[in-house]
């Protein structure tokens, strides 16, 4: 009996919202379908479906977005990405070095040496991203790093940005250098990471900490929170000495029982300027938004529009892949295993309507009865007809299908006349040119021209935009989508305020996401939070992203890292030494052992060295890094020669082959039975 989840359903803002899953005979996900219905009439308001397929090695190498041709990932080895096809047409090619790191990325109708878009990447000896050079010089970037693994400089043809950090690794300042320009922006925070008044602009400020991590005011707004710590009101701040005219605007935020933003309004002079309502599925993903804007009616009065602007959203797992309005549909294909957008496909709704057709099964069911009411075929018959239709359209009808038709007294020619002709809608395809984090900087057309470009600060605020073709580009930092009506960025589980560089509600996973439950990563240059839950570290250090590229790489590396920390916690409960002691040494050993088994000793060594470089901090013992690297070396050897990493690292501890600041003596050796209950989980 199958115990796989097939359907989830709930009511959101008066709508029945459901998610349906399909699986193959091996239990792998083959499809996800999202629906929104009017609960009173049963009318289907929104439908979105994504299909998945796998190759013989079990890698997810094919995805079929809703109403688009299949996307095929071309891979080699254990899943390293070599290219991408859309509906059989090659769009992207990747060249990699001997460590499987991406060195060249080409896009366009002639992908390869004559590609319209060609991005070349180089790396430092430590595996950090060193440069990204494009065949259009305006987007060239060179990266500079310090000895601690911090990104301290990004240089381009137009400007250079230099980054300063605190002793705890927080972004402390940004200096922008360009011809006739030298600007330094400081970022002051309290110990918990909350923004404080700029000491250069407000030298008289005595504020040193925000109680409960709730910012009450800044240079632009006054804020109010409810008993749950959720932002409920934001009002324009009137500077001291300015005469009040009661024209300040107030933003109001309302939430459901799951602390999700469901209603937003902006009011001025007691009248609403804009209102919006948000709809979520059972997994908390936003499925739709409705926006009413203030406009002049037929009588000349200004009031909210009667008919809202409706936007529908479609998802593939936790990644937003479809944005549909009343006029167009925008679909995004991401880099495998990441939140970095790769390809943008836009289709006008009129073109989509022309492409709508009945399947062969639907045609036969609708025309299969004399009374005109149609018939319902069994599911197995529908599958047979769907397969037959694919074969007819490809002009490759199998002998099996011909034999089946003969048994039914039918011919291929008879069924072919029932197949409705296909219409291929006109689509605009663009490539996302992103920064090292995955924030889009430009949209490149297939002929290599820039159709859109944007400039952002380190926290995702848009500083400048060139948009001659009026393209809608809502994506910001990985996992974020800009809402024009509120100025907020929807970030999967929460909403992010880019002006404050933090979330407007506490972290739904509590302290697992950090001590400050409003905090976005305090080093947004190298750390991202695509889920609105917790940070993903070492995004540019070479520790993960640039060492373990490929379809399974990032996911596998993150999973191994999490397992290593859990292994360390369990060993600490037995022998202690979670910091610079026995448990810490076993954690390093286990981490490198698992990385070696998964990626090989060369890449494991790169990951280990850059993990230590990124973790260096002011005031740490001088021997700490040497100790960790020695334990890493032991772990790499275990990965090459041992069957099970947990057992191997416990044995290294028991025999005194691991390293601590003050030495490690196995005065309390871990017995086989004592460690097996914990170690068996790894």
From Swiss-Prot:
Residues 348-360 have a biased composition (Basic and acidic residues). InterPro entries: DUF6973, RHS, Rhs_assc_core, T6SS_VgrG/RHS. Residues 348-372 are annotated as: Disordered. Belongs to the RHS family. Rhs elements have a nonessential function. They may play an important role in the natural ecology of the cell. This is Putative protein RhsE. The gene is rhsE.
């Amino acid at each position: 009996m199958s115990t796989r989840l097939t359907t989830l359903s709930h009511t959101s803002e008066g709508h029945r919202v459901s998610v349906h899953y399909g699986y193959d005979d091996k239990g792998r996900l083959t499809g996800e379908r999202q629906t929104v219905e009017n609960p009173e009439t049963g009318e289907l308001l929104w439908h979105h479906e994504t299909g998945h397929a796998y190759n013989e090695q079990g890698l997810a190498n094919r995805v079929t977005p809703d109403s688009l041709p299949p996307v095929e990932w071309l891979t080699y080895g254990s899943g390293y990405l070599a290219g991408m096809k859309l509906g059989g047409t090659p769009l992207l090619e990747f060249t990699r070095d001997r460590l499987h790191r991406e060195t060249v990325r080409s896009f366009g109708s002639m992908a390869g040496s004559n590609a319209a878009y060609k991005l070349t990447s180089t790396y430092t000896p430590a595996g950090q991203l060193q440069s990204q050079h494009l065949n259009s010089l305006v987007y060239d970037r060179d990266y500079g790093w310090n000895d601690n693994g911090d990104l301290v400089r990004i240089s381009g043809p137009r400007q250079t940005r230099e980054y300063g950090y605190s002793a705890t690794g927080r972004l402390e300042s940004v200096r922008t250098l360009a011809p006739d320009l030298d600007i330094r922006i400081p970022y002051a925070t309290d110990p918990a990471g909350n923004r404080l008044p700029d000491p250069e602009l407000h030298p008289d400020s005595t504020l040193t900490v925000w109680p409960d991590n709730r910012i009450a005011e800044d240079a632009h707004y006054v804020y109010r929170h409810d008993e749950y710590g959720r932002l409920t009101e934001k009002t324009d701040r009137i500077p001291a000495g300015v005469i009040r005219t009661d024209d300040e605007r107030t933003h109001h935020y309302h939430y459901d029982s799951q602390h999700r933003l469901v209603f937003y309004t902006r009011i001025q002079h007691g009248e609403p300027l804009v209102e919006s309502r948000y709809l979520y599925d059972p997994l908390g993903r936003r499925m739709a938004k409705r926006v009413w804007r203030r406009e002049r009616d037929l009588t000349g009065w200004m009031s909210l529009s009667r008919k809202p602007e409706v936007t529908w959203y479609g998802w593939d797992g936790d990644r937003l892949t479809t944005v549909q309005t009343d006029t167009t549909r925008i679909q995004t294909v991401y880099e495998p295993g990441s939140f970095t957008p790769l390809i943008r496909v836009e289709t006008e709704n009129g073109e989509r309507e022309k492409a709508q057709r009945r399947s062969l099964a639907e045609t036969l069911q609708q025309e299969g009865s004399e009374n005109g009411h149609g018939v319902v075929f069994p599911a197995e018959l529908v599958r047979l007809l769907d397969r037959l239709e694919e074969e007819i359209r490809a002009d490759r009808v199998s002998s099996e299908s011909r034999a089946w038709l003969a048994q039914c007294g039918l011919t291929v020619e008879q069924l072919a006349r029932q197949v409705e002709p296909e219409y291929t809608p006109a689509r605009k395809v663009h490539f996302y040119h992103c920064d090292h984090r995955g924030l889009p900087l430009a949209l490149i057309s297939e002929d290599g021209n820039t159709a859109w470009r944007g400039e952002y600060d380190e926290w995702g605020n848009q500083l400048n935009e060139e948009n001659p073709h009026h393209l809608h580009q809502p994506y910001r930092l990985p996992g974020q989508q800009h809402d024009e009506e509120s100025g907020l960025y929807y970030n999967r589980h929460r909403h992010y305020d880019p002006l404050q560089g933090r979330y407007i509600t506490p972290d739904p996973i509590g302290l697992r996401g950090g001590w400050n439950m409003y905090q976005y990563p305090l080093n947004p240059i190298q750390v991202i939070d695509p889920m609105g839950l917790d940070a993903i570290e070492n995004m540019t250090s070479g520790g993960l992203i640039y060492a373990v590229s490929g379809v399974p790489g990032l996911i596998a590396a993150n999973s191994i890292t999490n397992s290593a920390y859990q292994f360390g916690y369990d060993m600490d409960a037995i022998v202690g030494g979670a910091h610079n002691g026995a448990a810490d040494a076993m954690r390093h050993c286990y981490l490198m052992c698992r990385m070696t088994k998964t990626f090989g000793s060369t890449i494991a060594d790169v990951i280990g060295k850059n993990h230590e470089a990124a973790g260096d901090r002011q005031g740490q013992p001088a021997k700490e890094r040497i100790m960790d690297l020695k334990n890493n070396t032991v772990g790499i050897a275990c990965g090459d020669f041992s069957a099970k990493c947990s057992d191997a690292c416990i044995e290294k501890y028991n025999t005194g082959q691991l390293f601590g600041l003050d030495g490690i003596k196995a005065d309390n050796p871990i017995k086989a039975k004592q460690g097996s209950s914990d170690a068996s989980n790894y």
